Design a protein with these regions (language model features):
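Short solvent-exposed beta->alpha transition segments
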Residues: 67-116
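Sec-dependent bacterial lipoprotein signal peptides
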Residues: 1-32
């Protein structure tokens, strides 16, 4: 009987991991704001302020304060994912990488939606941690709200 219970628990754990992966994939699909990458940041964006906002979001991420990351986002970003779901996806990454050291590379770019009507600012930031690196892909709208916060 206990063998059956163990198998059921193993299956439940597997289903939970699959659900987490699907949540992450859905987040990527829904929140991808950069459909058309450009070489230059749109003139309406302040690159310095955009980087400050991205660094603030990464700071919250490093503190595992996922609700604050969500609060920095646009309405769609905030409605799509809960802080608990964010934690399920990101805690293992942070636990594996260890303590944050520094941002080693930042690249900014311009983005447009599929229709080419709305411009966004995109950032790719590479961060060193004790046990590896994390690459952040962050998209910000003209109101300096997060449209996308992806972690690799």
């Amino acid at each position: 009987m206990s063998g059956i219970i163990e198998r059921i628990m193993d299956l439940a754990g597997l289903l939970e991991r699959i659900a987490g992966m699907l949540t992450g994939l859905s987040m990527v699909i829904l929140l991808t704001g950069c459909q058309s990458l450009g070489a230059e940041l749109p003139e309406s964006f302040d690159e310095e302020r955009m980087e400050e906002e991205a660094l603030r979001a990464i700071g919250y991420f490093n503190e595992k304060d996922y609700q604050s990351v969500l609060d920095m986002g646009c309405t769609e970003f905030q409605e799509f994912l809960t802080a608990e779901e964010f934690a399920e996806q990101c805690d293992p990454i942070l636990d594996k990488r260890g303590k944050f050291r520094e941002i080693v590379k930042t690249v900014s770019m311009g983005c447009k939606n599929e229709e080419g009507e709305v411009e966004y600012g995109g950032l790719v930031l590479v961060a060193d941690y004790e046990d590896g690196r994390i690459c952040f892909h962050i998209t910000i709208n003209e109101n300096m709200e997060l449209m996308e916060f992806l972690v690799q």
